[in-house]
Amino acid sequence: TWDKVVKEQFEKRNPNRRVFQMTRAAFAGLQRYTFGWTGDCGNGDDVTQGWGQMANQIPVLLSAGLGIIPFTTCDITGYCGDIEDYPAMAELYTRWIQMGAFNPLSRIHHEGNVAVEPWLFGEEAEKNAKAAIELKYRLLPYIYTYAREAHETGLPLMRPMFLEYPADMETFSTDALFMFGSE
């Protein structure tokens, strides 16, 4: 496969360096070669569509983590769509950043020349983005622990609630909540 070849060729040419790559195509065994990415999602033309797109990422990330690649992420801020009214998007931006802090990899990304720096969304959004990013850094020892577990067992960092609470039947019908590790 492409990802296997890229990894092998990189390691051949750079024996003392680790390779990092992301893919949105997946099949069994791919987790040995790459990080998963859900692909381009959009915010649409208005804030309402953006909320739906962000909500859609959670079940996609959980499914990918369970079935294909335990290290899977999404484009924080939604990637596609014009942002014409930054103040109107501030709350959505804040929630994207907060949700993204609990992705195995946090990556703010948007298409073209659309700027997504926190300060563009106002002081409150900037403050909240900073807090989420600082939390992610404080969690690094925890993340490393569960990343090791994911490597050894295949259990993802982002986990559906039913993995931790299998006796609670309600956890099997929710796809909007998740655990980050088991604690």
Where are the regions a protein language model picked out?
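Catalytic-domain carbohydrate-binding cleft regions of carbohydrate-active enzymes
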Residues: 1-183
